[in-house]
A protein has these predicted regions:
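Alpha-helical transmembrane segments in inner-membrane proteins
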Residues: 1-207
Length: 207
């Protein structure tokens, strides 16, 4: 009976916890809370800067958690994550390549970094699947993890080469990207992330 009551409280608790994080995130900052609601500039800061960043952080965290769950189910390993099978490394290579190309004078749109990072992650995943799924059953999962580790090592080497070739400013941008930043968050990115999360939930094979 106690286990049943505990399970019933899991969903409300999961819905409540994000609110406990989002609200302090909106109200914390260099300016007092009253300033956010008393001036036009404060309203702009609240609705156009702070709220998109907080929602973006929430959605990105949800997507990362979802990706981790899917990969853990795929490889049947509760310790697996996107970094283990090379997806994160491939995405980092794509993003670093964009920074180096722009620093070299090549004119690329701002969304090109996202596109190259996505393409790098997909390419790394395809390589890992090709190398790792040559076996059968449990052995195939072991091969998959080993292939992911190999791709990660290769990605680290490529990032090291790109960092060596990069200018000081480009190297700083690569470092900031690898650390993660929400400074460029806006409502367009929030909607995009929400659609990506919704699509993942709808098309997830429930097996």
């Amino acid at each position: 009976m106690s286990n049943l009551l505990g399970q019933k409280h899991i969903l409300p608790l999961c819905l409540l916890l994000p609110l406990l994080v989002v609200i302090p995130g909106l109200l914390s900052g260099s300016q007092p809370v009253a300033w956010l609601f008393a001036t036009d500039i404060g309203q702009t800061v609240l609705w156009q800067i702070r709220l998109p960043r907080v929602l973006m952080a929430f959605l990105v965290g949800a997507l990362l958690a979802w990706a981790g769950v899917l990969i853990q189910g795929m490889v049947r390993n509760p310790l697996a994550d996107p970094g283990l099978i090379g997806v994160s490394g491939g995405a980092a290579v794509g993003a670093a390549l964009f920074v180096v190309l722009v620093a070299s004078g090549l004119a690329l749109p701002g969304w090109g970094q996202t596109l190259l990072a996505f393409g790098g992650g997909v390419l790394a995943l395809l390589v890992v699947l090709k190398l790792g799924l040559s076996g059968q059953s449990l052995q195939a999962m072991s091969f998959l993890i080993l292939a992911g580790i190999a791709v990660n090592v290769l990605a680290s080497a490529v990032i090291g080469l790109l960092s060596y070739m990069a200018t000081n400013e480009a190297l700083r941008q690569i470092t900031f990207w690898s650390l993660g930043s929400l400074s460029g968050a806006d409502w367009l990115w929030v909607v995009t992330m929400a659609l990506a999360l919704t699509a993942g939930l709808l098309f997830w094979p429930r097996r």
